[in-house]
Amino acid sequence: MKRIFSVVVCAVGIFFSMTAESKDGCLKSYVSADSLLLYEYYESHIWVSPLNYTRVFSEQRAVAPDWFHYRDRVIELRVLALRKRIWDEYLRDFPLERLSVRVWLMFSLRTGELETVELMFRREVLEDTDSFPIREIIAMCMNSDWSGSTYIMEHKPDKYDNMYTGYIFPLY
């Protein structure tokens, strides 16, 4: 009886160790296989794509439940706070159309701090970016003086526009 018990314990231990080691690999394979994933996982960062984050895949929940808890408790609150502050301080005076600006955010998994911010504009908005406070918005998001380059990405309307609601500033 003792021998059977030890074999069962050993088998369970091997299963859980294999599961733990393959967790990152599984998540990465989901990222590469599906471009609509909410999160792209790296060694130390989590990339928050501007897709509708309420869309949850069962595979993601099974592989990485911790990331969803992290999203609900940390990322969502910070994003909502950033959206409100940017709108109040900068965007209220700019007559841009709805869905003209997309914001990409990267948070550190180790510290939970926001580390990268990218703004993406529609083509017609690029003509007015000289007066648009891009650097100020990025600096405010990063909570520091912005000394790096500002990247402006051109966006062409696509079939996923109606999904970009979670991390887009609704400009009215």
Segments from the language model and where they lie:
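Bacterial Sec-dependent N-terminal signal peptides
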Residues: M1-S29
